[in-house]
Structure formats: C-alpha cells, structure tokens
Regions:
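An acidic, glycine-/histidine-flanked metal-binding catalytic module
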Residues: 1-37, 143-217
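Short connector loops at helix/strand junctions that flank enzyme active sites
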Residues: 81-83, 129, 144
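Residue(s) in the substrate-gating loop at a strand-loop-helix junction
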Residues: 88
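Hydrophobic side chains in well-ordered alpha-helices
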Residues: 43, 96-102
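Surface-exposed, low-hydrophobicity interaction/linker segments
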Residues: 24-71
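Short, flexible, solvent-exposed loop/turn segments with mixed acidic/basic and small polar residues
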Residues: 70-80
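Helix N-cap motif at beta-to-alpha junctions
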Residues: 91-95
Length: 217
C-alpha cells in the first residue's frame, strides 16, 4: 500500500481530535502500524546477543497509539518513537551500557541511525522509573520508521512490571497517568521501592536497609 507521511499525520490529527476515520484512512493506519514489524526482522538479522539476556519485541497496540496521540502535546503519528518496541533485560548496571554500545555498533548503518538516548538510569523519572531508552530510525521505501529499544536490569523490570500489574488490579494509571503520582500513597511507595532497588544494585546495603525501615515503619 502506498502512503505518505503527510497522509499519516493527517490521520493522526483526526485521531487526536476524536474524528472517525473513513475506510481508506483506517486501512492506511493499520498498514502503517503493521509495517513496523519489519524492524523486528531486521533487528534479529543484525543483532545476536548472549542467551543470558532476555529479548522481547512488541508492536504497540492500536488502542495505545490512539491514547498516546490524544495526550496533551503529543507527537505527530509519523514521529511516535515506540510503535515498534524491543526490550532487553540484563543482569546489572554495567551490562546496560555494554549492550547499548554493542547495539550501536551492530545497528547503525546505511538504513538505520540512532536518533537519541533517554537515560532514565542516570536520571530516573520522578516516579522512580529506571531504564535506558534508545530511539533509532529505520529507512524503509525512503520513509523513516522509528523504533525504541529499552535496556533494563531484572530488578528494574520487576519494578516496572509490578506497577503495571497494580494498575490492572486496582484500576489505577500509575504507569502513564499525567497526574502527580507522588501525591498518592501508591506513587510514593513505588518511588521509594525503586530507590531501594537502585541502592541494592549499587551494593549500598546500608542505605537500602534505612529506606526499607522508613517504608515499613
């Protein structure tokens, strides 16, 4: 199917404004999402990591794309970074940056470039989220498709997954909500747990113990 970036972005505007798409627009929207699967094929051809790492790929759900477009100050549809997402789970801090460097060596080339990094390891989000995000762009039929690779430790992944599960069980929105999460007891609890895990990974057991005592007393 032929598509242009201009048409894709117009579809994104209609979605943002909650205007129904016609059948041709819906088909183009579906196609634009679907072609991002090509990135996974290219990734596995170029990248062969050790079995000690866990690698997971996912294509962003249609509902999640729509929700992202309808947020305040959202990106254009063609510029969304994580329609194609790859997550690599490693064992410790050092491996995060080792894998990061290796990915750049293996992926960057004629049709793939690194756009930027978001280092939430060195600068965690206010809610305690920690991970290294690498945003790449892949050229397909003279059009750029963005994709995101997240690299995190097992403990960081445990924290993030626990937040998601809590959201599902309690019908909360701690993961992606735009409200001040730290004004809720749950948000403050998970932030402190993240700090405990960070100290533990840095082998700062004294600080970890003090913070655990603060959380549970």
């Amino acid at each position: 199917m032929e598509y242009t970036i201009s048409k894709i972005n117009k579809i994104g505007v209609k979605i943002k404004e909650s205007i129904a798409l016609n059948s041709d627009e819906q088909e183009m929207f579906n196609y634009f999402r679907k072609i991002h699967e090509l990135i996974f094929e290219k990734f596995y051809k170029k990248v062969n990591l050790s079995d000690k790492y866990t690698i997971v790929t996912r294509l962003k759900r249609m509902e999640s794309i729509i929700n992202k477009l309808q947020r305040p100050n959202s990106s254009k549809l063609s510029r969304i970074d994580d329609i194609a997402g790859i997550r690599i789970i490693v064992n410790n801090f050092n491996e995060i940056y080792e894998v990061s460097e290796l990915l750049e060596k293996l992926l960057i080339g004629n049709n793939c470039q690194l756009k930027y990094n978001k280092d939430y390891i060195k600068s965690p989000k206010k809610d305690g989220y920690r991970s290294l995000h690498k945003i790449f762009t892949f050229n397909y039929e003279n059009k750029n498709l963005n994709f995101e690779i997240q690299i995190r430790t097992k403990l960081q992944h445990l924290w993030s997954t626990t937040v998601e599960i809590y959201d599902l069980i309690e019908y909360k929105n701690l993961k992606s909500g735009s409200f001040n999460k730290l004004k809720t007891w749950e948000g403050l609890f998970f932030k402190r747990c993240s700090k405990v895990m960070e100290n533990f990974e840095k082998e700062d057991f004294i600080s970890s113990k003090k913070l655990v005592n603060k959380i549970f007393t």
